From Swiss-Prot:
GO terms for molecular function: carbohydrate derivative binding; glutamine-fructose-6-phosphate transaminase (isomerizing) activity. It comes from Xylella fastidiosa (strain Temecula1 / ATCC 700964). Its EC number is 2.6.1.16. GO terms for cellular component: cytosol. Residues 285-425, 458-599 form the SIS domain. It is found in: Cytoplasm. It comes from the Bacteria. It catalyses: D-fructose 6-phosphate + L-glutamine = D-glucosamine 6-phosphate + L-glutamate. This is Glutamine--fructose-6-phosphate aminotransferase [isomerizing]. Homodimer. Keywords: Aminotransferase, Cytoplasm, Glutamine amidotransferase, Repeat, Transferase. Pfam families: GATase_6, SIS. The active site is at C2, K604. The lineage of its organism: Bacteria, Pseudomonadati, Pseudomonadota, Gammaproteobacteria, Lysobacterales. Residues 2-217 form the Glutamine amidotransferase type-2 domain.
Amino acid sequence: MCGIVGAIAGRDVVPVLIEGLKRLEYRGYDSSGIAVLESGSIRRVRRTGRVAEMAVAATQEGFTASLGIGHTRWATHGGVTEANAHPHVSHGVVLVHNGIIENYEVQRERLSAFGYVFQSQTDTEVIAHLIHYYMQQGGDLLGALQCAVKALTGIYALAVMSQAEPGRFVCARMGCPLLIGIGDGESFVASDISALIQATRQVIFLEDGDTAEIRRDGISIFNAEQCPVERSLHLSNVSLSSLELGEFRHFMQKEIHEQPRVLADTMEAAIDAAGFPPMLFGAQAESVFRGITGIQILACGTSYYAGLTARYWIEAIAGLPCQVEIASEYRYRKAYVNPQHLVVTISQSGETLDTLEALKYAKALGHRHTLSICNAPDSAIPRISELICYTRAGPEIGVASTKAFTTQLVVLFQLAVALGVLRGAVDAEGEAAYLEQLRQLPCSVQQALNLEPQIAGWAECFSSRHHALFLGRGLHYPIALEGALKLKEISYIHAEAYPAGELKHGPLALVDADMPVVVIAPNDSLLEKVKSNMQEVRARGGELFVFADQDSHFSESEGLHVIRTLRHTGVLSPLVHTIPVQLLAYHTALVRGTDVDKPRNLAKSVTVE
């Protein structure tokens, strides 16, 4: 959600800023801008719309400089206008900001009384004026920033430069990701490593409360008490190829097709261990797992659906009660606390604000044991978790999550079996059987991917529809939810999902010839129940699109379309059936001509409430 990039070097940094912002587009945005300090003067360009349009304007105006900052904005305070786009300027102070300032109205009134005139509706402009105010009181840029952040309530990542101090820029972090890149005689700042990968692989992750001074010849970092501190230097393993399309038309398509490989990468430790040892989740996991009596999962969006799937596995395989809750709901209610329950948070980015705050809330309530499942090392949620298990999905650029979701499912399945083995609910034979199912999973997923031409053929049937209904039962109900979410996210077709058994309790009223109904119908113990639900749809003139197993014994007829995946894959069937609903959403969006990788109004990393 929003993106920051900044650079100071002995070369022209404008190409670095533009390329960095392009690599941050996946986070979601509606406007962008850069500002540079050139020959003692500030030059700025801002545009609504795509970064490419802003970049053309910067080129036409001949931007070139050795110091600059840039930003992609996802509107929160104020509409999508050029005046509200970043960077903001106040009397030679230039600033970009991610986050939300909660007390901006109070500060705005205060600054207006001092004579400051506001040009935008944003909370960000308040910070620029505030920093200038403290500089007027005799402070330098860094000191003014440190004074300003003490006056702010909320979350932020900031990069600031001043016309009065052309040899450096400064930054600050509280609640929003921000990292520093170290180059050879040049330094950078960004909200995401992908923005800097073309310039450096050496990065330092700032912590909450940190401020920093960024110079060509080095950096200085200060903690919340303004004391100098050292933060660890990391070497990023993100590759440029993982951030490029290659042979694919969209990142979403690429990431769907990467799933056999990333699933194999994620399960590699279990395969190497020939089982599901607790150490997959950290050195202290065994002692923690032995003492727990239940699981509480907290997540948002697609990660929440992964948690819903995990509940079936954890209760059936490990014999432990499992609750799953949307993080943004959990954090605002008086929740039940059992110190012997393990709190599991799931987040692709590791920075999802509601999930992060829900975890902090759970710990404050008295939950002692926490596990983070995340795709981003050194992000905020893992840093405050007792146990960590990283998915190995690699960078996910498409806003609609695909490979991050299925790798989360693999980790959650491993958790269920590890708990089952430790509790004696799974014997050696059962563990070996689960391991074999896991080993076969990448091949099964590849077979599902081979169905893409057939699924693309269905997309024409959906492209002119305004609504769709997804049905599933048991383990596959969360996959129906995920399918509906994917369709609405990228094709803008209103879609809902229900347990198939709930049809007659309301959703059946929606069914008619104009309502396509997608059914996930594996050959499991609930298949006959699902077939009965399908008959209810057919009796009302509904058109059925069924994803079935090879041996589910469906025959196509008018109003009944069937794509067979493969023979039933047991408890891992939800992962295999995820692939067809991803492909259906993708190809429907293609036919409708929407922006697949950057759907309107959405952001990849949701770092505000």
